[in-house]
Amino acid sequence: MSRRRRAKKRIICPDSIYDSRLINMLVNRVMKDGKKSLAYKIVYQTMDQIAEKTEQDPIQILEEAVRNTKPLVEVKARRVGGSAYQVPLEVNPERGTVLALQWVLAAARNRSGRSAIAKLTNELIDASKKTGGAIKKRDDVHRMAEANKAFAKFRF
């Protein structure tokens, strides 16, 4: 067991242009090596491209993409008697949002093409339409949890 105190939850401030916490969460995950202004530029240009392509509010597209990608259950490894079981657990909403953003970004980075903006734009639009790599990842996690339903009795 850890002897430290439990870390306090950080309050995520909404961004200045769209006044959305989700945008700020996305920016913090797009950011590499502390280059936050570059991350803001990528995310804002992505939002502009989404608005151009879909002719809808980009915040609604982002929220829809995250809502479609959020997992309901996940599996965690638990050692019981020398063997590790994949135990299915329900995901709390905050962690679901974080996982959805991580999966959307990972799927966008795995896409072919040069521009990070174009890849992220296409992945968010696909996720809002319930297609794309992030949705596939969510379905894989759900399938894994369904397959290991028998080990639900070993909950944490």
Curated annotation (Swiss-Prot):
Pfam families: Ribosomal_S7 (PF00177). PROSITE patterns: RIBOSOMAL_S7 (PS00052). It is found in: Plastid, Chloroplast. The keyword Ribonucleoprotein applies. Keywords: Chloroplast, Plastid, Ribonucleoprotein, Ribosomal protein, RNA-binding, rRNA-binding. The keyword rRNA-binding applies. GO terms for cellular component: chloroplast; small ribosomal subunit. It comes from the Eukaryota. CDD domains: uS7_Chloroplast (cd14871). One of its GO terms (biological process) is translation. Its main location: plastid. GO terms for molecular function: rRNA binding; structural constituent of ribosome. InterPro entries: Ribosomal_uS7, Ribosomal_uS7_bac/org-type, Ribosomal_uS7_CS, Ribosomal_uS7_dom, Ribosomal_uS7_dom_sf. Belongs to the universal ribosomal protein uS7 family. Part of the 30S ribosomal subunit. One of the primary rRNA binding proteins, it binds directly to 16S rRNA where it nucleates assembly of the head domain of the 30S subunit. This is Small ribosomal subunit protein uS7c. The lineage of its organism: Eukaryota, Viridiplantae, Chlorophyta, Ulvophyceae, OUU clade. The gene is rps7.
